[in-house]
């Protein structure tokens, strides 16, 4: 089981997602629950998880929905996940 932490920017992203679509918010919550239970290892291939590079070096990303992304940092040793950003491709990149 991983501890989940949130950045201030993630909290802002979450408010925007909830305002745009309750269904997207629920889908994101489901992925966060999966991550909490087993980290990135517990996500199946349908989420297209992968490591990022550049300014998000060492971060993970997955596709909650085709245009809803989640970016996080994960520490295996500390069993900690920091949720960094969430949103559409246009919002994040």
Please report, for each region that a protein language model flagged, where it lies by residue.
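Residues forming the ATP-binding cleft of Hanks-type serine/threonine protein kinase domains
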Residues: 87
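Basic, Lys/Arg-enriched alpha-helical interface segments
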Residues: 1-66, 75-80, 90-93
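Acidic, metal-associated active-site segment
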Residues: 72
């Amino acid at each position: 089981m991983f501890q989940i932490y949130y950045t201030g920017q993630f909290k802002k992203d979450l408010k925007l997602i909830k305002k745009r679509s309750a269904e997207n918010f629920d889908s994101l919550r489901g992925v966060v629950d999966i991550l909490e239970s087993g980290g990135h290892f517990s996500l199946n291939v349908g989420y297209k998880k992968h490591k990022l590079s550049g300014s998000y070096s060492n971060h993970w990303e997955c596709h909650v929905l085709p245009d809803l992304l989640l970016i996080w940092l994960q520490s295996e040793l500390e069993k900690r996940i920091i949720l960094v950003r969430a949103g559409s491709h246009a919002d994040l990149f």
